[in-house]
């Protein structure tokens, strides 16, 4: 459903955000 899609998107964004914090460009 749409809820799981939103959760998946948020999870991806969170992972990307963590990588950005750990390894700033």
Swiss-Prot record:
GO terms for cellular component: extracellular region. It is found in: Secreted. Disulfide bonds: none annotated. Expressed by the skin glands. Keywords: Amphibian defense peptide, Antimicrobial, Secreted. The keyword Secreted applies. One of its GO terms (biological process) is defense response. The keyword Ribonucleoprotein does not apply. Antimicrobial peptide. Belongs to the gastrin/cholecystokinin family. Magainin subfamily. This is Xenoposin precursor fragment BM2. It comes from Xenopus boumbaensis (Mawa clawed frog).
